[in-house]
């Protein structure tokens, strides 16, 4: 028996998530992973690397709870929000029996995580405006334990209608969790659903330090939920999910000075986003620029594959969305520095279409 044959059937069939780094490239303008364009620095204050870290570092939990407006017992910290996705599926879904549901086009890790654990995936396509198709969701809820809703949605950039999410929460009460992925909520904080946690005990909110906090390399995310949900997740999380340096930096990033710095970064990105949107609308190969509430822009291009390859060859790395349902011809562009935006604009203007 070969090593391949020893592996689980579903793992042999699995197509891994194609992260920005996995796709590679030799660029000097990286606009494919929705990272903050410049680095932030911190001084490490904890020098106890000979000891194992806390499972849930107190300073990180308390600082995030204060920032998010929830109780500390409603917060779980993990290795990025991606680990939160995995924990929810592991804790609530029986392999071979239960299902998760999501609405494409959306973030790809919901399906990859479910498939890894042998849990059925149900994809209910979004409406033409990328909002929830509530009747279709209702028709597909049997056996579903977790519904993932990305808002603002990656890669389309729009907020999911809050009233539709409320309808979904009523529809799933006593049947399934509704997980609102708010990875990009710092760019539109008025749209957060954290204020609904008391009203809906089956609501879960995912957050991250990877985007507006400019700490994608830290791998630190949060799950906000009813205490009963957090207690169950604590049963399946690894004993030491955060290293001591990660917890040290996260606590600093979530202190008042760190929060203020994050909000200044958001204001900077919003200015740069508008600059890039205005320029894209006047470029010949750009057919449509979609509204965005995030730090990235989705646009539809004439000959998008050729445009993508041309910019790639010039060291400008964007994210190709052609394989996502309803996103034919679309590329996603992270909002970077003014210099990076200008590189994109100049390269696109030079395209012959």
UniProtKB/Swiss-Prot annotation:
Broad EC category: transferase
Recorded metabolic or biological pathway in which this protein acts: Amino-acid biosynthesis; L-histidine biosynthesis; L-histidine from 5-phospho-alpha-D-ribose 1-diphosphate: step 7/9
Disulfide bonds listed in the record: none
E.C. number(s) listed in UniProt: 2.6.1.9
One of the GO BP terms on file: L-histidine biosynthetic process
Keywords: Amino-acid biosynthesis, Aminotransferase, Histidine biosynthesis, Pyridoxal phosphate, Transferase
Modified residues (N6-(pyridoxal phosphate)lysine): 211
A molecular function GO annotation: pyridoxal phosphate binding
Cofactor(s) needed for function: pyridoxal 5'-phosphate
Substrates-to-products reaction catalysed: L-histidinol phosphate + 2-oxoglutarate = 3-(imidazol-4-yl)-2-oxopropyl phosphate + L-glutamate
Pfam families registered for this protein in UniProt: Aminotran_1_2
Family per similarity comment: Belongs to the class-II pyridoxal-phosphate-dependent aminotransferase family. Histidinol-phosphate aminotransferase subfamily.
Subunit structure: Homodimer.
NCBIfam families registered for this protein in UniProt: hisC (TIGR01141)
Protein name: Histidinol-phosphate aminotransferase
UniProt gene name: hisC
